[in-house]
Swiss-Prot record:
This is ACT domain-containing protein ACR6. The keyword Lipid biosynthesis does not apply. GO terms for molecular function: amino acid binding. PROSITE patterns: ACT (PS51671). Residues 30-110, 120-207, 250-326, 328-402 form the ACT domain. The keyword Phosphoprotein does not apply. Disulfide bonds: none annotated. InterPro entries: ACR1-12, ACT-like_dom_sf, ACT_dom. May bind amino acids. Gene3D superfamilies: 3.30.70.260. It comes from the Eukaryota. SUPFAM superfamilies: ACT-like.
Amino acid sequence: MDDDEYAKLIRRMNPPRVVIDNNASDDATVIQVDSVNKHGTLLEVVQVLTDMNLVIKKAYISSDGGWFMDVFKVIDQDGNKIRDTQVLDYIQKRIESNAGWFIPPLRSSVGVMPTDEYTSIELAGTDRPGLLSEVSAVLTDLHCNVVNAEIWTHNTRAAAVIHVTDNSTHSAITDPIRLSTIKELLCNVVRTNSGSRAAKTVFSCSDTHRERRLHQIMFDDRDYEGVKRARTSASRPSVTLMNIEKDYTVVTMRSKDRPKLVFDVVCTLTDMQYVVFHGMVSTEPVEAYQEFYIRHVDGLPINSEAEQERVIQCLEAAIERRASEGLELELSAEDRVGLLSDITRTFRENSLTIVRAEISTREGKAKDTFYVTDVTGNPVESKIVESIRQQIGVSKLKVKKKEKEHCSVLGTSRPSHETTTMGYLLSNIFKPK
């Protein structure tokens, strides 16, 4: 029996144990996960919590040899404990079943392949105003219906994962000639103004989590390179690295809190082949604090300055990719062929730029979220927003109310390394070099 088969046997003999407690904390549901440790275990657990739209208020991560233990304090989107027993049972079953999944490593290239239900298309290229409008127009002309999609933009780059079906059959597109035509026309759209950076259009058969796949696409497209530093310090994340004894690198991150932040960071570390051995997460309205003790999968800390700079850049990019810049617009309407094309064309004709979008359809209903700015990246004037709502339908397109802006993130007092929970617990064990 080789080492890989032996590791699988150990995991089967020691299934994960999940304990959910609503009495241990006054303001959160506590989820404890104990399992055999392997690369990607932490990401699997965080991915389940993220997919359930749970908010991670605090987390404590620790691994001892081949064993892994996590404690998460979570709440729902309304800030309450998770009381529904069916939801709690589902969380437990998902975590226990996911613990056996194999998480594939980061792919070196972006590749279009159909599943039975839909055809998955991945795009990467230079961002520009009207890009999503042009892409959706091409798909409509080719008799493709967008059933769900997610589009991210960051640092002049754009990435998308789009699931489409045939208009007539409502199933995946399998004709290789038609797939080739779709790929060619989409590539022409994405390639425009791409300059020296290659544009990519592929059909993907990957079963990788969609949001993780978007991180991989943008990482492969090197969106972390040459990030402009002119933005105010309060709007940028702070990432620092420090090597300590016991051959750990401590990664400390401070940023404005937002949904799915922990997933984005853990996903990036995992795909960069770093293992989290210990860590803590604490999120507050003003600031989110994350601290991880990591090594490369080869067991070594981050030694070179070049590697340290690359990790910092990549984590900053991971935090920024879906920071909610722009005005959030929510569309609720009857789904129909060409709906996305019509909506995005209206945005383009009114000089709006889509910086991020989530497209979904369910039971004949379209529920889409768009984050928009004007073409210069500035806030959209209210009169333009109202004009667009009149064109699309006031009851269909709504402006999501923004929470009150908090005080400057970097202007608030922060815990030092010694006074954070993890820093306090480990300060007597690990001393800075």
